[in-house]
Amino acid sequence: YPDGFDGEAV
């Protein structure tokens, strides 16, 4: 996922 829930891209 993009930046939104943790701050990193997965």
Swiss-Prot record:
Q: How is the cofactor bound?
A: Binds 1 Mn(2+) ion per subunit.
What is the similarity comment for this entry?
Belongs to the phosphoenolpyruvate carboxykinase [GTP] family.
Q: Does the keyword Hydrolase apply?
A: no
Q: Which reaction does it catalyse?
A: oxaloacetate + GTP = phosphoenolpyruvate + GDP + CO2
The keyword Lipid metabolism appears for this protein: no
Q: How does it assemble?
A: Monomer.
Q: What does this protein do?
A: Catalyzes the conversion of oxaloacetate (OAA) to phosphoenolpyruvate (PEP), the rate-limiting step in the metabolic pathway that produces glucose from lactate and other precursors derived from the citric acid cycle.
> What are the entry keywords?
Decarboxylase, GTP-binding, Lyase, Manganese, Metal-binding, Nucleotide-binding
UniProt-listed Enzyme Commission number(s): 4.1.1.32
Q: Which cysteines are joined by disulfide bonds?
A: none
Required cofactor names: Mn(2+)
- Protein name stated in the entry: Putative phosphoenolpyruvate carboxykinase [GTP]
Q: Which GO terms describe its molecular function?
A: GTP binding; metal ion binding; phosphoenolpyruvate carboxykinase (GTP) activity
